[in-house]
Amino acid sequence: MDEIINKYQAVEKLFKEIQEGLAMYDQYKTLINELLHYNNHIKQEYFNFLMIISPYLIRAHSGETLRNKVNNEIKRLILVENINTKISKTLVSVNFLLQKKLSTDGVKTKNMWCTNNPMLQVKTAHNLFKQLCDTQSKTQWVQTLKYKECKYCHTDMVFNTTQFGLQCPNCGCIQELMGTIFDETHFYNHDGQKAKSGIFNPNRHYRFWIEHILGRNSEQELGTKQDPCGTKVLQQLKKIIKRDNKCIALLTVENIRKMLKEINRTDLNNCVSLILRKLTGVGPPQISESILLRGEYIFTEAIKIREKVCKKGRINRNYYPYYIYKIFDAILPPNDTTNRRILQYIHLQGNDTLANNDSEWESICMELPEIKWKPTDRTHCVHFF
């Protein structure tokens, strides 16, 4: 227990040091806000941990025999609540943010994807923080020019397209912007064109599909107004399994999709992993946060490349589970049979579509050094049942 408390205190000290060290630099405000989210999260986890063990600590003063029993119970709670993994998960995210910031500043860092020791991760985060400070100290001579601020009344100026520059709303002072092209066509939609509602975010698609592939989505997604918990759907599926004499332990993604089609509930195709877990009692492998973050990075890069190299004549929308399948097939070692079970929870499309996807993926891999291209083998996941 003392070891866990020491880990939480080490993380708290780390966050405080980073926040105080970077607060003086304007360019790190966004980074500090992102880290603040993880700081609040780890504080809440620490509070919850203390709430769980506090009743046992009170009982520990009742005698040596009971004290030993209480200590064993606390150790069991630490394992059940997966405390070390929760701390490690937060630190992996923090290190990822610090590495990302350093890479944008042009500083090369060593990736720590597979480190699962919280205290080592604290040390890694501290070293990354020191690199950020060292990078900033080397560039202190660089000054930020507030070009939007009026030099007479110090208020923010606004763009004036007719004067080709910035104009102060108070004194009317105009500051010409050299080398800037003003074109009114940028300020309204062209005829026949539709304005975009937002910026495309590949990370959002990745997290959505990973959540569903790993069966981490809410069980409420199986329900309806009449059946909030999805009990009726599961009962219907069990009847089909019994009718067809299927072995529950050998059910596959394709089996569930066919049964959902039979009961007219193809709207639940995204929830197949969750349904498999509910029916069989065995869920997808719980991939570590470091591997998931690495997968997210490669996925984002792959989608960016795809937008550049995709065939103009192709109308099919992106099928994101295919990309996730190819990424994890590439980054998970062949002997890691536990984690590679994730492949059997990903539905692959028909042969013609799969061939087109493989051809497109080959073009993506040419510009994606992290992945070596190979054709998709549908029978590959059979080895992991």
UniProtKB/Swiss-Prot annotation:
Question: A Gene Ontology biological process annotation?
Answer: regulation of viral transcription
Q: What GO terms are given for molecular function?
A: zinc ion binding
Supply the alphabetized keyword list: Late protein, Metal-binding, Zinc, Zinc-finger
> Which InterPro entries does the UniProt entry name for this protein?
Poxvirus_VLTF3, VLTF-3_Zn_ribbon
ZnF (C2H2-type) spans are 166-190, 168-190
On induction, the UniProt comment says:
Expressed in the late phase of the viral replicative cycle.
List residues traversing the bilayer.
none
Family membership, please give it.
Belongs to the asfivirus B385R family.
Q: What is this protein called?
A: Zinc finger protein B385R
Upper lineage is:
Viruses, Varidnaviria, Bamfordvirae, Nucleocytoviricota, Pokkesviricetes
